Amino acid sequence: MSTATSAPVVESMSDTVVCPQLSRHSTSLEELYTIGYNRSHSPSCFSSAGCEEEEGQKNVLAERYKTKLCKNFVQYGTCPYDIRCMFAHGEEELRTAEMNIMDGLVTKDAITSFQKLWHRAVSASSGSKHHSSHVANRRGVMTTATTTTTAGGSTDAAMHICRRMQRVVAAAAAAVPCGGRRVVSGSIRIRGCVRHNPYCHNILPTVSRYYSTMPDVFTRPYSKSDSCGNEAITEGNAWTYANEEGNEKETPAMISSGVPELTAWKRFNYVAERSQCTSVPEQNLPCADFAAIKESNNTGGNASGVDVENVDDAEHSTCSSVGNESGYFCRASRSASCGEQSQSHLKREGNEGRGEGLHMFLSL
């Protein structure tokens, strides 16, 4: 048997790989090849030139396979060669030349068989199949690895691959949940996954999703009458005001699915605005009662015998709603056609020299 001479190692393609720093042993590749691979079988060729060429090719494959990171995978996250790529797709796939020689990954057929086993192990641990399929895949890996032999007739190299793939499959199957189920060490088995969606539209209203906690003030609509006699009718979640003419005006919903849409301050302002009288005459016009009083005076005096005071002031006054600072003093009296007696006279001092104002409520 002739002594094997060292062949020049072909440098890896620098434009397609990224070279990480890997730990190297002091033992040469030729010595590792001799004790790890050639020990199990005799060389297939007996000529010095043939063995030299074969050993050189094996050293090149051992130096190249998965010893460097794939540049396409690092830059773009994908590689067109997928599992057939000679370079590592991630740090977990990085290998050293010594590991390739010890596992027999020095020929094209051995590397192809290893790639098939690796792909089957990854597919088995993907979690898309049931636990029984993982067991079947593991058995298939063991059977295939046992019956597979390399081009040089090495059975030990296939056994190295078999034992290595068994550890990979066992670790992957324990880490990845199967069929939506997960087994945690020291705990019970979690059956299935949570299917409840807390943000489903028919469980929580849209407004409630923006509250970290429920508001302190929780109000519900109720029937009441404002100062103008319009009754607020509650129908469902909306407030409806029915005025004297029978027209109904629906306001925005005060409460939406159990959560108040408006705050307490906005609701107070809203009720205050709606409480103003909408059926009174326009501004700068005399009230209906004063118009009736003026008519009775022009037709023959006060038929009811009630004194009408400050009629001139009354003509210039306005029938305003609560909160209107007109600055005029207005006093109401019973008209000749009305059989009702005036109820109350309210006086209010005006600020900043505006004079006295009157808030007058008329009973119909």
From Swiss-Prot:
Gene Ontology terms, cellular component aspect? cytoplasm
Region (Disordered) residue spans: 340-364
Instruction: Reply yes or no: does the keyword Zinc-finger apply.
Output: yes
InterPro entries documented for this protein = Znf_CCCH, Znf_CCCH_sf
Biased region (Basic and acidic residues) positions are: 346-357
Cell compartments where the protein resides: Cytoplasm
Q: How is it modified after translation?
A: Phosphorylated at the N-terminus. CK1.2-dependent phosphorylation may lead to proteasome-dependent degradation of ZC3H11 in absence of stress.
Residues in C3H1-type zinc fingers run: 64-92
Disruption outcome: RNAi-mediated knockdown in the bloodstream form is lethal and causes a reduction in chaperone mRNA levels in response to heat-induced stress. RNAi-mediated knockdown in the procyclic form causes sensitivity to cytoplasmic protein folding stress (induced by high temperature, puromycin, arsenite, MG132 or ethanol), characterized by a reduction in chaperone mRNA levels.
Role: RNA-binding protein involved in regulation of mRNA stability. Binds AU-rich regions in the 3'-UTR of mRNAs and promotes their stabilization by recruiting a MKT1-containing complex. Stabilizes chaperone mRNAs during stress that causes an accumulation of misfolded or unfolded proteins in the cytoplasm.
Instruction: Copy the domain comment.
Output: The zinc finger domain binds AU-rich regions in the 3'-UTR of mRNAs.
The protein's name in its UniProt record: RNA-binding protein ZC3H11
Originating species: Trypanosoma brucei brucei (strain 927/4 GUTat10.1)
Write the lineage as a comma-separated list: Eukaryota, Discoba, Euglenozoa, Kinetoplastea, Metakinetoplastina
